A protein has these predicted regions:
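Bacterial Sec-dependent N-terminal signal peptides
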Residues: 1-29
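Function-determining sites in protein domains
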Residues: 19-189
Length: 189
């Protein structure tokens, strides 16, 4: 009984001694918007091929298990989960895109100005570090005069990306609601 009384007293004391803090700001303080400065566009292009797949979460583990069964299975894994392509000249995977479950669409040039606002250098960053393995279900192939000049692999679930073929600073890609804007554009195609 005595032990119960002491335990209750300690809990009551701890509860009462917790400091409550008023978090509300005074009305005179206004939020200062983060100024974003834009730099160089990532790619100088005249065509974008958009590849997408509806790979289900449950099938991802299967990709890893099956990657050594055939060339198609290997590409399915390396394109969707891994680092393929490693360079802008590593284009063999493009021959397999439809075989590994991607659907190809052409992005109308009327969307290019909106896309340029996303694939551009930014000085401000409101990004975060993702703690998941990216599954690249959306891939953009940027071309100039029929030649591939840039590739962007996007994981909308993790907000991760892999962009190759540009010397622009891609570090702040994804800030300023880039993922939401890009997803909206791609869903409208």
């Amino acid at each position: 009984m005595y032990l119960k009384f002491i335990t209750l007293f300690v809990l009551f004391f701890l509860f009462c001694s917790c400091k409550k803090e008023n978090i509300s700001e005074s009305p005179s303080k206004e939020a200062i918007p983060l100024e974003i400065k834009y730099g160089k566009v990532f790619f100088d292009y005249d065509q974008i091929d958009y590849y997408s797949t509806n790979l289900e979460e449950g099938k991802i583990e299967e990709l890893d298990k099956n990657q050594n069964k055939s060339k198609v299975d290997k590409y399915k894994y390396t394109v969707t989960i891994d680092e393929t392509p490693e360079t802008i000249t590593d284009l063999a995977f493009l021959k397999y895109m439809e075989k590994i479950g991607f659907v190809k669409k052409k992005i109308d040039s009327s969307k290019f100005p909106e896309i340029n606002k996303i694939f551009i250098e930014k000085t401000a960053s409101d990004g975060y570090a993702a703690a998941c393995v990216p599954v690249f279900r959306d891939i953009l192939i940027f071309k100039k005069l029929g030649k591939v000049i840039g590739i962007a692999k996007i994981c909308f679930g993790c907000h991760q990306y892999r962009i190759i073929g540009t010397d622009a600073d891609t570090e702040n890609f994804g800030t300023n609601n880039d993922y939401e804007k890009l997803k909206y554009i791609l869903n409208s195609i």
